[in-house]
Every structure is written in C-alpha cells, then in structure tokens.
Amino acid sequence: AGRDLEEGLKAAKYLQDAGYDMLNADNGTYDSWYWAHPPVYMPLNCNMAEVTRLKEVVEIPVVCAGRMQPDEASASISEGKLDAMGIGRQFLADPEYIVKLEQEKFSDILPCIACHNACLPIYHYEGVGCEIDEEDGKTQGHCALNPRTFCEQKYDFEKKAAVTKSI
C-alpha cells in the first residue's frame, strides 16, 4: 500500500521546493501504519535504508524513526546519512531516556518493547487518560513497562522522603 521509493523521493523534492524546512520520514502510510509505528515483530532501525536514500536527494534536514537504536542513529548522524533520530514511544516507556543516554547509563534504560499498549489506544480514545472506559472496559493508554504513563495528573508520583526536615 502506498507509493514506491522513487515516487517518495520525487515527492520529497517537491516538498523541499515548496518550503518545507525538515522531513520526518518513515515508510508508513495510512494503510501500512506499522512502518510508522513498528510493532515488536518489525526489525530495529526498519526505516533506515530508505531514509538514508532520501537524505541523498534533498538538502533539508532528514529525521528517521522506527525502532531506532541510539548507537545506529549516532553512527548514521556522524556519517551524514541522516540529521536526527525520531523518538516517540521510547519516552512513554522511559521519560528519562535522554538523560540516561547522556550519562551513559545504558543498562538503566527501560526500552520500549513496541507493544502498542499505550500508543494505539490514543487514537481509539481521541486522547489519553488514566481511567478504564466504562463502555468497553479498555484501559486508556498505559505503557506495558511504565504504568505511570498518562496518569501524572491523577496521581502524585513525586518521591517523598519518609522523614522530612527543614534546612
């Protein structure tokens, strides 16, 4: 479903000529959404080959997403194959992802498992919440690895000391 690579490259040039200042690219379309939001059975860095080809034909920055791994993204950015790594679902699993990368605490990162437990309900419910829908019993957007996802407004998750003191 969708267009082939050559048609996509031609469209990207049109968008650049029309004034777009960046392209956030993946292989997904409405009918093949799984390329834009790859589930667990899709390979890591699954959009990389096509997006690096896109980078060769346009002069504006190109961002790639799709189960991107930081080491692969870093190497591709260093080599000029793309300009940035697109990150979305990973922040649901671990909101401190970037901090842990910067501090090289790789073993502390809670990786997104691409389960779509929190991501796809966003579309079903036209937003997110921290409740169970009474009509169909579905939970509105809870990450399988991070139960705090979308519940920040309802619950106070701030860590508090057992004994407080005034300093």
Task: Label each region the model flagged.
Residues 1-167:
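Flavin-dependent oxidoreductase catalytic cores
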